[in-house]
């Protein structure tokens, strides 16, 4: 498999084929609002991620944002790269939304790293309103818990 674009560009596109190709230098602190991928997140989502990161830190877990807000052009680039990687639009859509459908473009989705942070957030995220949305993306979270702190059932993938 060849990596197209930047390494961090594929963070949301690659899922079950192996570990996400993200170097720690590509990750942003949830508190670095000068980074547009963080600073352009929906304010409620950003606050929830920051609260979760603080709580995770108390448990010895470092939480980073590997992908947050994305421009429509960047989202389209991710989709185009995924089409090349997976061989078809339909296969790519299992991993990457269109710019019109992506919650990243509206600042309402965030990808969290590393693996221990993903695991921690899957177990504890609902306390902050944060829910894993797709079964094949352990790192993708949205502010989706209901008033009782329950997350919706997982969707199989982004095309669902």
Give the ranges of each region predicted by the language model.
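Secretory targeting and sorting signals
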Residues: 1-21, 25
């Amino acid at each position: 498999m060849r990596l197209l674009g930047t390494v961090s560009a594929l963070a949301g596109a690659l899922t079950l084929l192996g570990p996400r190709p993200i170097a720690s230098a590509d990750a942003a602190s949830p508190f670095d609002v000068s980074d547009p991928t963080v600073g352009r997140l929906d304010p409620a989502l950003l606050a929830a991620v920051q609260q979760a990161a603080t709580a995770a830190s108390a448990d010895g877990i470092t939480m980073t944002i590997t992908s947050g807000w994305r421009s429509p052009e960047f989202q389209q680039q991710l989709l185009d790269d995924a089409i090349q990687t997976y061989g078809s639009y339909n296969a790519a859509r299992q991993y990457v939304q269109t710019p019109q459908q992506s919650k990243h473009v509206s600042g309402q989705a965030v990808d969290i790293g590393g693996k221990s942070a993903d695991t921690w957030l899957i177990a504890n995220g609902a306390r902050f309103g944060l829910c894993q949305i797709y079964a094949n993306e352990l790192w993708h979270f949205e502010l989706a818990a209901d008033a009782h702190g329950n997350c919706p059932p997982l969707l199989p993938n982004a095309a669902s």
